[in-house]
Amino acid sequence: MSHISPIPEILADIKAGKMVIITDAEDRENEGDLLMAAQFVTPEAINFMIKHARGLVCLPMDGEMVEKLGLPMMTQKNGAQYGTNFTVSIEAAHGITTGISAADRALTIQTAVSPTAKPEDIVQPGHIFPLRAQKGGVLVRAGHTEAGVDLAQMNGLIPASVICEIINDDGTMARMPELMKFAEEHKLKIGTIADLIEYRSRTESLLEDMGNAPVQTPWGEFQQHVYVDKLSGETHLALVKGTPAADTETLVRVHEPFSVMDFIQANPRHSWSLPKALEHIQQAESGVVILLHRTEDGASLLDRTLPKGANQAYKWDSKSYGIGAQILAGLNVKKLRVLGQPSSFTGLTGFGLEVVGFEEAEK
């Protein structure tokens, strides 16, 4: 796709203070955002975004910046489809009028991302919407929020960006054909989150591989691989049957969270129990069961056993998404046949993974 610029070119434009267009996967939001490093924002840049892109002007920031400003999350129960972490909206405490003009919004952003910014420098609510990026960036969550922080951080800039969705004249979201025309008209480069994931994956990993050894289970022998999460310090396991090959399908079960409740099989939201998944994969030529550890509090443990949970769809934890993908990529798994109900797994392209089908558990 010649209209897609390689990540080094995208990085160069970001470092030069230019805007770029960043797209996500077609099976995710399937949108393109204007994006620039926040420290270079100007009233003219904001005006261009609101005039030509027409979306919501947001301010992706890393967690430390959000905490330094004392910004609470917009809601304690995030029900957004893709888990975007909105904080409360903000305004510069001084130097603005209504807060909505391009100049006022630019000043608010400049104030918030200043290295000397303090909580008293901003007020809430306002006309700028900060977004808290996941630690680990696009290797953890394949979103525009994380891409914005990554692209700034990789250039040694302040870890914050300004983004705005691109909307067509008729109010619909701009897809790739329209984005290509937009880029050509305004002389902007287009980059993809998938390419950014692939670029970072070549030189970075969020996991430390602690080694592997055979392990006997009631369902037969597996090769146990142990990984330590560099961000959380938690330990994740992969139980591998056979030798996964890149050109053949591999049965995959990603079990998350893996906790004491699995030993008594008190997990009605998982269509495949851990024993059932291990038994099924042991009968296949190759397969992988990933056990992602995440500390659970008492409330979440009880919630697993409540009757109301039985009919609720299991919501994938975005913080674990990239971890599972990195484990699979490292095991040479490319084509996944997932043990579970059909669902959308976004952002896998950058890890070189493809879901070819699903297998639901028998009732």
From Swiss-Prot:
Entry EC no(s): 4.1.99.12
Pfam families: DHBP_synthase, GTP_cyclohydro2
Family to which this protein belongs: In the N-terminal section; belongs to the DHBP synthase family. In the C-terminal section; belongs to the GTP cyclohydrolase II family.
GO MF assignments: 3,4-dihydroxy-2-butanone-4-phosphate synthase activity; GTP cyclohydrolase II activity; magnesium ion binding; manganese ion binding
Binding site for Mg(2+) 2: E29, H144
Spans annotated as GTP cyclohydrolase II-like: 205-363
GO BP annotations listed: riboflavin biosynthetic process
Cofactor note text: Binds 2 divalent metal cations per subunit. Magnesium or manganese.
Name of the molecule in the record: 3,4-dihydroxy-2-butanone 4-phosphate synthase
GO CC annotation terms, alphabetical: cytosol
Binding site for D-ribulose 5-phosphate: R28, E29, D33, R141, A142, G143, H144, T145, E165
Entry superkingdom: Bacteria
Sites annotated Essential for catalytic activity: H127, E165
Cofactors (names): Mg(2+); Mn(2+)
HAMAP family hit by this protein: RibB (MF_00180)
Summary of the function given for this chain in its UniProt record: Catalyzes the conversion of D-ribulose 5-phosphate to formate and 3,4-dihydroxy-2-butanone 4-phosphate.
Residues noted as binding Mg(2+) 1 in the record, renumbered to the chain: E29
